[in-house]
Amino acid sequence: MRISSKGRYGLSAMIFIAMTANTDELITVNCVSEKLGISKIYLEQVFSLLKRAKLVISIKGAQGGYQLARKPEDMSCYDILHALEQSLFEQTDSSVDERAPEIEKVLKASVWTHLDNVIIKELKDLTLKSLVDKVDSSKLNSNLMYYI
């Protein structure tokens, strides 16, 4: 599976915002851009899609920015990727439908539909909160000193 940069950057930006979800702080596109090293113009496109999907709330003005529309535990990776990667969840094209419809039928029922369902289930089970927890855990582990 190949996730576009829009999906990868959007997921990274949402994790970054979720890490500040306990505060009422608004996060600007500039802040995300600087912290993650992503183009501001590209992030504006990503946030536009996230806002349209009602995953973030935007506040305009000098003190404006973005914050999550829901708690991180109520938002899944599926929600985010579905907003940013609509082609990821499209039906697979037929490959041999005209000459071998029985093969195509088996492929669709046993492989493509099953694979889609497994991926969607895993993405729905993976919450933004669980990703933030993993980032926090990773930070703790990287700060440990090991002596021999």
Predicted segments with their positions:
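Alpha-helical residues within the helix-turn-helix
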Residues: 34, 51-52
